[in-house]
Amino acid sequence: MPALVLLGAQWGDEGKGKATDLLGGSVDYVVRYQGGNNAGHTVVVGDQKYALHLLPSGILTPECTPVIGNGVVVDPSVLFSELNGLNERGVDTSKLLISGNAHIITPYNVTVDKVTERFLGKRKIGTTGRGIGPTYADKINRVGIRIQDLYDESILTQKVEAALDGKNQLLTKVFNRRAIEAGQVVEELLTYADRLKPYVADTVLVLNKALDDDKVVLFEGGQGTLLDIDHGTYPFVTSSNPTAGGACTGSGVGPTKISRVIGILKAYTTRVGAGPFPTELLDEDGEALRRIGGERGVTTGRDRRCGWFDAVIARYATRVNGLTDFFLTKLDVLTGWEQIPVCVAYEIDGKRVEELPYSQTDFHHAKPIYENLPGWSEDITKAKTFEDLPKNAQAYVRALEEMSGAPISAIGVGPGRDETIEINSFI
C-alpha cells in the first residue's frame, strides 16, 4: 500500500492534528519526519483536548503505531513530559517507535538558541527558543548527538566535548555566559538512556517492511510549507523541511512509495513570529478572527497574526509539494461575515503578480489584491455533507479549490473529531 503525506500548506497551525487524527483510524503508522517540539497541534477526542508538541497525532489512536523518524530532533525531557501526561489520562503510549538516528536537543542547544535571540534583539527571527535551530546546525556541522549515542558513553562523551569546544567560546566570549561542563551534559543525557531504550528502533527498516506488507503509512509534517528552510519565506523559517520531500529524507522511505500528498489549508491565514504576511489584518477583522478561531500558539502561547485567505501561497504550496488534495479547516470561523475577501494576486511596484515572487524583497513589498466573496450567517458546525453547507459557504469552498490548484477533499466545520465533512476519501 503506498504512503500518504499530510502537511501544512501555509505558515503552520493549519489544523494538521485534526486531519491526522481523522485519518488515524484508517492508517497503520503515523510518522513525524521533521521538526521537534517547536510544532504544536491540538487534537479533540470527545470532550477531551490533547495538546501535542513532539509526539505524532496517531498516538491517540490505539490501532496505530506512532513513529518519530530520523529527521526529527528530540528533547528527551519534553518527550517524557508528553508521554507522562498521556499516560495519566489513560492513553497507551507503548507502541511508540523512535529512530535511533534522530538527533537529540541538548541543554546547550537550548541555551545557545535563547541567548542568540536575546542578543539579536529587534533583528531576531522569532524562534521558539527550544533549541531546534542549533540542533539542526549541529547535525549539518557533524557534531550532533544522536539517540543511538546514548548507548556508548565513550562516543557520547567525545561528541559532547567536540560540540562544546566552539559553543563555550561563543558563550563566554560573545554572550558573557558561563562555560558549560561536558561531564554534566553527558550525565544528564545518560539518565534518559534506559527509559528511551524500549522505543528505539530501526524505523527505516520498520516503515519499508510495513509498506511491503501493504500497511498504510501516513507521514505527518510539522509547521508549514512557507516555513520550509528551502522553500519558505527565508530567513523567517524553521530549520527543517516540512514540505513533501522532507517526508522521504526524514523517514528513509523513497518517493516512489508515496501516492498522495494532502495539504492542510486554514479557511483564512495565520502566522506566528516575524516575517512577511501580505494579507495580515491589523484591524477589528483580524482581532475577530483571532478571537473566534482561538488563534494562540499551542507551543509558544503567542497570539497568532491573522489575515484573509491567500490563494497565491496556496498555489505555491500545491506546486512545491505536488499536492493531490486539500483538507480545508476552520471554515466555521468565517460564519457571520457578509463579505469575505480572498487574496487572488499581489501588487508589487505597480504590477499585478499572480505567483509567489522569487525575490525576498518583492515579497516584502507585496500588497494583496482581493476578490470579495459573499459570506453566510448560518451555523455550519452540524453539517455532515457538502450539501448541508449554506450555498455561499459551498461557493467559498469551490472558489478556494479553483484558485489553489487541487481538489478540497475534506472540510473542518468545528474543532471536534466528528465535525468534519469528507467529500473524497483520502485512502
Curated annotation (Swiss-Prot):
GO cellular component terms given for this protein: cytoplasm
Main location: cytoplasm
Cofactor note: Binds 1 Mg(2+) ion per subunit.
Needed cofactors: Mg(2+)
Amino-acid positions noted as binding IMP in the UniProt annotation, renumbered to this chain: D13, E14, G15, K16, N38, A39, G40, H41, T128, R142, Q223, T238, R302
Pathway(s) it belongs to: Purine metabolism; AMP biosynthesis via de novo pathway; AMP from IMP: step 1/2
Entry protein name: Adenylosuccinate synthetase
Species the sequence originates in: Streptomyces avermitilis (strain ATCC 31267 / DSM 46492 / JCM 5070 / NBRC 14893 / NCIMB 12804 / NRRL 8165 / MA-4680)
